[in-house]
Amino acid sequence: MERLVKGDIVTLNFPFSDLSGFKKRPALVVSTLRGDDVILCQITTKDARSDEYAIDLSNDNFIEGKLPRNDCLIRVNRLFTGDKQIILKKSGKIKKQKLDEVREKLKEIISN
């Protein structure tokens, strides 16, 4: 797999919050750590607009690649640290402005 950086959109088997299983879904790379770990935010196509931490994501927000659907949400409060080996493929990269929006929302979550 090619080198991953902040802002990359990847596809992986994302675990359920209760760790009872997983589902193949896209995620946003928010940090790459030493070794083979990355920190990711879940991306969903389900209606999570009631989630105050969700950020709209459309194909207009990409500088390369795209998602199969154009009405997605980045679930900034759904973080996951995983080994790069679980990543199935790189799907694209979001624009700096959208990544900055995610960073600001992460700061808001952490500072509360």
Regions found by a protein language model. Name each.
Residues P15-L19:
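Short, charged beta-turn/beta-strand-edge "cap" motif at the junction between a beta-strand
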Residues I63-N112:
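C-terminal terminal-subdomain/extension
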Residues S20-K23, V29-N61:
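Compact nucleic-acid interaction/catalytic patches
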